Structure formats: structure tokens, C-alpha cells
Amino acid sequence: MNKSRQAALYELPTKLQNSKEELGKILEEEEEYYKYISEKFKYSKRAKESEEVVGQMQEAYKLIDEAIDILMKYLLIDYT
């Protein structure tokens, strides 16, 4: 494996973790917005859309977390 590819692989978990943290912050804000919208406009299209966005963001957050775990296992197995 060439050195630039190896370096990129080692940087990837950090980049994914940073993305996960950013997504976590945005997710918190979106969850607060969803709570507000769902209380104020219980059955509106806007509340439903917000609920869907929160669900998709939660799923993305879980997938990023799983990707970090898998990548770290790969790096530890391959390069130690």
C-alpha cells in the first residue's frame, strides 16, 4: 500500500469523528426544532417533514458511528 493511501486511511477515523460531532450538534438543534414544531403545529406537513429529517439524521449518526468502529478495527488488524 502506498504511503499516501495509508496516511489517508489513518486520517479517516478522525475525519469521520469530526463529521459525527458536527452531525450530533445539528441533530440536537433539529430535535429541538422538531419538538417546537410538533407542539405548535401537531398535525402539519411541516411537523411531519421535521420528524422525517430527525429520523434520517439519527440513522446517519448511527451509521457514521458504525463506520468509525469498523474502520478502527480494520486499521488495528491491518497495521499493527
Show the residue positions of the predicted features.
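Long, low-complexity or tandemly repetitive, helically biased scaffold regions used
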Residues: 1-80
